[in-house]
Structure formats: C-alpha cells, structure tokens
Amino acid sequence: MTLNQVVQRIKTIALAHKQINDFREGDVISFLRSGDIVYPACLLQILPGRISKAERQTTVRFALYLCDKVDLSIDSKDNELEVKSDLLSIAEDMMAAFDYPTYKLDWDFADEASIEFLDEDLEDML
C-alpha cells in the first residue's frame, strides 16, 4: 500500500465511526490553529518509520489523536471523565476496525497501542 492509501483507509475508518465528526492529517499545531474543527475529531500525525530490504517491509508509524471538548458549564470533572470514557471507546473501536479481515490482506497493524489522556486549555472550550 502507498502512504496515501494508508492515510485514506484510516480516514475512512475514522469517519465511519458514528462519534467522529472530523478527520485531519498533519501536525498538532496546524490542527489546533485550523479553527474549524468539528468535534469529536481525529488527527493522524505521521511519524518516522522504516524500510527493511531484508524483511521486504515498510513500517509506517503514526500518532492518532482523538479529541473532544469538555463542557465546563456543567460538572466539569464528571463531564471530563465522560469525554475520556467516550474517546477510549472510540480508540478501542478503531483498533478493532484496523484488524478487519479484509484489511489484513495488505497491511499488518500492531496488536498494541499506547494511550495517553491529555488535558489542554485551548481556545476550543465551551
């Protein structure tokens, strides 16, 4: 698969999820500066990878950011936990979708992924 095909497939999977409203590919700063994000959103950031002649394999690494807003006008701690819970569910759903049998024909997706919850005070706050 080409890099374009990989990105397009991830975009298709992300936007097929009923909770994801927006998908972008790029860096975090550009994503946050775009100003027209429809949350919950997914950002795909391509990271350094590798090409192995011996294994005849190209490894593409990326960071997948799942983002949503916390409504500060209601009980923010409970709302924040609810948002994190929803985003974790989305991540689990996407990991399962990456492993779909048809996709296994042309890509081998890692069995594990690291997760990290980030809290940022940004302009995109309610």
Placement of each model-derived feature along the sequence:
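A short, hydrophobic beta-strand-centered structural micro-motif
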Residues: 37-48
